């Protein structure tokens, strides 16, 4: 198949290489022209994926029309808060027979839409059969080195999710299929907020008990909100829910956990973000998740406290105490 990846960050580059090695004709689009030229020349992505060679046959371009035209699949690897602006530049006539696969993990601010909902909102002519997502515990740093990984491809149309499953499957990258596209997206997005909370626990030098509590109660509130929004409960116990939450809360590769850790150690959010090359999706998602919780009248105490720490400058120690001294509940 002819497949383009929009977004040459670590994950976009990793998936481009994986798909190329799987026998597909792959184009990788980078929005900065100078960086696209650098990638083409050096055949490494030293900022976002150092040490990994990009095959010479893999096409790298800054031209969006070239990347989009006459492709079977467009992989959308642009951060969630910037994806709409990229999609807005695409004419439906160029993608009327193309599957759009989102691999971003976030909820759009203001609209409170998942990426699949935003795609349909931005391009009304899109059929739901053309929209899919890929999510799960999958750090680019490991997938690019062929470390065994399992993820989920989801679409409302089973044939679409099956096509993505077949396109991406390798001996080291196992893909399951699902039709619960909403649940897969919500799990992948909301867990980033919980991972910031887990990082705060690390940075504040609390223990394993505290972190385990944040993670398990985090799954509980993610599931509550997801179910209220119409997702399936079993999705949150799977790879895109529990699986992704575990790896994002625990891994040294996790940008969201890193942000939380730095805040727990006393640093300010603006200084942390300024020092990072890559995007920590959970920062902005904490806004959207808090608003969705209010909209659907669902209690999400961890998400609420993470939001207050990030945007209302609440002391992490005070936030932890407030969580621990809430009214008694049954599990």
PLM feature segments, named:
Residues 1-52, 62:
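NAD(P)+-binding Rossmann beta1-loop-alpha1 motif at the extreme N-terminus of oxidoreductases
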Residues 9, 13, 33, 61, ...:
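Electropositive phosphate-/nucleotide-binding environments in soluble metabolic enzymes
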Residues 82, 93, 118, 122-130, ...:
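Internal alpha-helical scaffold of NAD(P)-dependent oxidoreductase catalytic cores
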Residues 198, 227-237, 241-331:
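NAD(P)-dependent Rossmann-like dehydrogenase/reductase catalytic/cofactor-binding core
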